[in-house]
């Protein structure tokens, strides 16, 4: 018997990228399960979670993928990005080196992901105001220069987590609605079926994921 979470109009794959320790896993768990784990260790391999939201009267199911940021996981790059229509590029506002590495992550994203992918720059751990190492204005200017949307979040106290995911999913939905992307060869992810209007009956799960 299908659960309520299986009923949706669109399925969007969104990836979380950025250095290890910036809070990607906690952003994922805060948005999908409203949980935060102070003791969370670096993610090993890949995991994903889902959550459905309403965008302009349509049910959009987000399939959010998370992986560790360490170099040794580069081998999974192409599979990780395949079919992704959105990316949250995350850095830690209290660790400038994680912001410096945004450039490298952005290059990797543009090398491996679809050219039309929607990208949001996310300054996480905004609750660490007293330790801030990356000025908001600096990151905002960088985002504008690279045509990224931008937001600061705190997975710990929930600030802007909902807004970050809702904003990027809405932006993806509008791209679909405006025919910038679609479900055929012109679509994000090279027609992998990641963006799909749901038929009347629940689609097979395999249709929704990486082929």
Curated annotation (Swiss-Prot):
For this protein, the record's CDD domains field holds:
Rab11_like (cd01868)
Q: Where is it expressed, tissue-wise?
A: Expressed weakly in sperm, but more predominantly in oocytes. Expressed in the intestine.
Location of the protein in the cell: Cytoplasmic vesicle, Secretory vesicle; Endosome; Cytoplasm, Cytoskeleton, Spindle; Cytoplasm, Cytoskeleton, Microtubule organizing center, Spindle pole body
Q: Name one GO cellular component term.
A: Golgi membrane
Span of the annotated motif Effector region? 40-48
Q: Where does GTP bind?
A: 18-26, 66-70, 124-127, 154-156
- Which InterPro entries does the record match to this protein? P-loop_NTPase (IPR027417), Rab_GTPases_membrane_traffic (IPR050209), Small_GTP-bd (IPR005225), Small_GTPase (IPR001806)
Attached lipid, kind S-geranylgeranyl cysteine, located at 208-209
The protein's topology relative to the membrane is: Lipid-anchor
An annotated Gene Ontology molecular function:
GTP binding
Which one Pfam family would you cite for this protein?
A: Ras
Q: What happens when the gene is disrupted?
A: Zygotic lethal. RNAi-mediated knockdown results in a reduced meiotic maturation rate of oocytes. Embryos are multinucleated and osmotically sensitive with permeable and therefore defective eggshells. During the first cell cycle, 52% of embryos fail to extrude polar bodies, 83% of embryos display no or minimal pseudocleavage and the centrosomal-nuclear complex does not migrate to the center of embryos.
> Where are the annotated segments for Disordered?
187-211
* Keywords, alphabetical: Cell membrane, Cytoplasm, Cytoplasmic vesicle, Cytoskeleton, Endosome, Golgi apparatus, GTP-binding, Lipoprotein, Membrane, Nucleotide-binding, Prenylation, Protein transport, Transport
Which GO terms fall under biological process for this protein?
A: cortical granule exocytosis; eggshell formation; embryo development ending in birth or egg hatching; exocytosis; membrane addition at site of mitotic cytokinesis; mitotic cytokinesis; protein transport; receptor-mediated endocytosis
Alphabetized PROSITE patterns for the sequence: RAB
Function of the molecule: The small GTPases Rab are key regulators of intracellular membrane trafficking, from the formation of transport vesicles to their fusion with membranes. Rabs cycle between an inactive GDP-bound form and an active GTP-bound form that is able to recruit to membranes different set of downstream effectors directly responsible for vesicle formation, movement, tethering and fusion. Involved in regulating the meiotic maturation of oocytes. Plays a role in egg shell formation, regulating exocytosis of chondroitin proteoglycans following fertilization.
Q: Which family does it belong to?
A: Belongs to the small GTPase superfamily. Rab family.
User: What is known about its subunit structure?
Assistant: Interacts with rei-1 and rei-2. The GDP-form preferentially binds to rei-1 and rei-2.
Record's protein name:
Ras-related protein rab-11.1
- Source species: Caenorhabditis elegans
């Amino acid at each position: 018997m299908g659960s309520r979470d299986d009923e949706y109009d669109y399925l969007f794959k969104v990836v979380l990228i950025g250095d290890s320790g910036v809070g990607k896993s906690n952003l994922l768990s805060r948005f999908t399960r409203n949980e935060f784990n102070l003791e969370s260790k670096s993610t090993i391999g890949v995991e994903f979670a889902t959550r459905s939201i309403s965008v302009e009267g349509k049910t959009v199911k987000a399939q959010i993928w998370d992986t560790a940021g360490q170099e040794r996981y580069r081998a999974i790059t192409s599979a990780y990005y395949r079919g992704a229509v959105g990316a949250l590029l995350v850095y830690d506002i209290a660790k400038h080196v994680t912001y410096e590495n945004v450039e490298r992550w952005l290059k990797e994203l543009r090398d491996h992901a679809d050219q039309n992918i929607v990208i949001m720059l996310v300054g996480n751990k905004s609750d660490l105001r007293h330790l801030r190492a990356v000025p908001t204005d600096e990151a905002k200017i960088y985002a504008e220069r690279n045509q990224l949307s931008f937001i600061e979040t705190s997975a710990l106290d929930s600030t802007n987590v909902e807004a970050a995911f809702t904003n990027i999913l809405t932006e993806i939905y509008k791209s679909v609605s405006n025919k910038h992307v679609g479900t055929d060869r012109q679509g994000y992810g090279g027609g992998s079926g990641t963006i799909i209007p749901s038929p009347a009956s629940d689609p097979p799960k395999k249709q929704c994921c990486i082929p």
